[in-house]
């Protein structure tokens, strides 16, 4: 009986490698980046401290408890930060409008947060969306897309698509056509951003006027 189980496991692994083998992107790696002899800035030390805090927030936990701790920590990242923007909850599509004083509601940004597709929310990224609305004078819609593992990856993708179509015709005050449209996101949200604009192109929708992908996850083969 044992050898049958082992044979099945070997077959599954072999079939996976054969059918889902992806391109090796390691040839794109570079090792000639210039190294500057400089003292790390205070901002650099603060970022490293935040990363350490993220690891400490779930130390000793496993499984669902670890994930819940990470989510709670991320949602607290913007706590205590003074925001200039008005925040408005939106039920469908689920998300949050971030409106800096004097922003033009016909100028819109769909912001897709990061968090490894399993954490993060409009709340966790308010420091970013608040600043974006101020700088661009645009109404920012931070999408609260469905996360894994409670949902499938494609559920989050579909949420992004539906939100984009909705934003073309709706602003924070109701039905209103868009004049200028941007899609932006960080990390996992940056990956969703790139996938979304390709889908927009392939489906003949009004294309975004700009797309911003902050540190997007682009190589899921993990070879580069």
What are these regions, as identified by a protein language model?
Residues 2-100:
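A glycine/proline-hinged amphipathic helix-loop "lid/cap" segment
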Residues 6-10, 17-23, 55, 84-224:
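Alpha/beta-hydrolase superfamily serine-hydrolase fold, recognizing
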């Amino acid at each position: 009986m044992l050898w049958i189980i082992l044979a099945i496991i070997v077959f599954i692994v072999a079939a996976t490698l054969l059918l889902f083998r992806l391109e090796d992107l390691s040839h794109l790696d570079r090792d000639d980046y210039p190294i500057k002899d400089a003292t790390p800035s205070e901002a650099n030390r603060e970022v490293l401290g935040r990363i350490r805090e993220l690891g400490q927030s779930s130390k000793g936990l496993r499984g669902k408890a670890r994930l819940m701790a990470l989510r709670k920590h991320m949602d607290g990242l913007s706590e205590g930060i003074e925001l200039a923007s008005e925040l408005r909850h939106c039920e469908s599509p689920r998300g949050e409008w971030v409106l800096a004083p004097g922003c033009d509601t016909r100028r819109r940004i769909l912001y897709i947060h990061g968090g490894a597709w399993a954490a993060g929310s409009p709340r966790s990224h308010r420091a970013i969306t608040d600043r974006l609305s101020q700088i661009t004078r645009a109404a920012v819609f931070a999408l609260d897309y469905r996360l894994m593992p409670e949902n499938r990856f494609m559920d989050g993708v579909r949420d992004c698509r539906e939100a984009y179509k909705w934003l073309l015709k709706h602003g924070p005050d109701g039905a209103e056509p868009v004049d200028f449209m941007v899609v932006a996101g960080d990390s996992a949200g940056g990956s969703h951003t790139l996938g979304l604009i390709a889908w927009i192109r392939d489906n003949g929708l009004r294309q975004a006027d700009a797309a911003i992908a902050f540190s997007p996850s682009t190589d899921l083969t993990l070879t580069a």
